[in-house]
Amino acid sequence: MTCRTRFAPSPTGYLHIGGARTALYCWLEARHRGGQFVLRIEDTDRERSTQAAIDAILEAMDWLGLGYDEGPIYQTQRIARYQEVAEQLLAQGKAYYAYETREELDAMREAAMAKQEKPRFNGAAREQNLPYRDDPNRVIRFKNPIGGTVVFEDLIKGCIEIANSELDDMVIFRPDGFPTYNFAVVVDDWDMGITEVIRGDDHINNTPRQINIYEALGAPVPRFAHMPMILDEQGAKLSKRTGAADVMQYKDAGYLPHALINYLARLGWSHGDQELFTRQELLDLFDVKDVNSKAARLDMAKLGWVNQHYLKTDDPASIAPQLEYQLAKLGVDIAAGPAAADVVVALRERVQTLKEMAEKAVVWYQPLETYDEAAVMKHLKLGAEVPLGKARELLAAVDAWSVENVSAALHDAAAALELGMGKIAQPLRVAITGTQVSPDISQTVYLAGREGALKRIDAALIKIGAA
């Protein structure tokens, strides 16, 4: 049987980091087993579902590179199908109409709690075979088996058993004519031929209810894999403040999509001690049965380390568009400075994120207006005009502006003055960047461009008072 998995988010908000990991594991399992991956949008919550959230989910999936074979499929476009299946269950005596008011349901709940019992529907209408009538309280309830136990082998958690006596006759169609989650998801997974349902372990209690519906329909029951949640660095439930952010906020924070994929893959799954994986290695090695049954903790330092690895090792040309995105966010005119790929080469050993890289790179795209006063006092004092002047002279004479030719000119300047490179580099670094910290001096000067470098040296000479 062909493996078919699905990712089925509700568009009531952004795609957060836990949802992204679920999508990744579903995608990896399908790809690893040569199957198909389906994207379904569970948008039947009409009050909370928004088009903006749908767009955000699709954008995040695209950014992460999690392509789907089918979809997006929208539940709101399948209402007639849910009604058809509900009517089938009614005709077979496996579901029934119920008309209890909110007050009657509240009274049932209070009576159960008074007896220290689990609040539940008492099944009063179960055998009454009430006909359809136009009533604002009308629902359709599923006849859950009264006896026996639901047993399933979870691919991550192992054997799980829940007695049917713990379950009541749940609503499968609401008064507004829309299906409930537990019913719609079964019909969808049945129709779509889903063979593996991979989701968070907050759905474990839904699973026995869903299995009973599958069996009532005579539908094949998929295999289930319930992943533990992701905790924050203190071991508490994730919040927006501690990492449960929109996936696209990780893009805005300067993380590479494949770095986030690598990190999320390891957040609950492992292959020996290996930390870094190519996408192909993940496809070859991933098996949902190897996912840890214990909750994983988010580790932002680890994510930073993974991201820096890819910043250091990826082709600079592939990183350049993402650096340009960060520069544009800072209001930088990209055309006013060096090629982004050259900036990547210069800065990637010094940063963990593209946001940091962009912030450091601004100096090459905008006029230098401020200087670190401590750097000026130390390196742009009287006497510095000599190495700066010689460097300017030889840089102005460079034929083809390149890192190599800039480096040669600076070494020639140092040799002509019989100075160590530090005596040339430090005043030049302050002249070009306004600070005493920058990448290799040849790269620093090269990125300023010939005209920009000469202008900045001239400004520094004026500052020294030796122009």
From Swiss-Prot:
Listed GO MF terms: ATP binding; glutamate-tRNA ligase activity; tRNA binding; zinc ion binding
Residues reported in the UniProt entry to bind ATP: 240
Catalytically driven reaction(s): tRNA(Glu) + L-glutamate + ATP = L-glutamyl-tRNA(Glu) + AMP + diphosphate
Superkingdom of source: Bacteria
Record PROSITE patterns: AA_TRNA_LIGASE_I
GO cellular component: cytosol
Pfam families listed in its UniProt record: Anticodon_2, tRNA-synt_1c
One GO BP: glutamyl-tRNA aminoacylation
Keywords, sorted A to Z: Aminoacyl-tRNA synthetase, ATP-binding, Cytoplasm, Ligase, Nucleotide-binding, Protein biosynthesis
Chief location bin: cytoplasm
UniProt KW DNA-binding keyword: no
Motif 'HIGH' region location, chain numbering: 9-19
Subcellular location(s) of the protein: Cytoplasm
EC number(s) on file: 6.1.1.17
Annotated function: Catalyzes the attachment of glutamate to tRNA(Glu) in a two-step reaction: glutamate is first activated by ATP to form Glu-AMP and then transferred to the acceptor end of tRNA(Glu).
Family to which this protein belongs: Belongs to the class-I aminoacyl-tRNA synthetase family. Glutamate--tRNA ligase type 1 subfamily.
Subunit-level organization: Monomer.
NCBIfam families named in the record: gltX_bact (TIGR00464)
Protein's name in the database: Glutamate--tRNA ligase
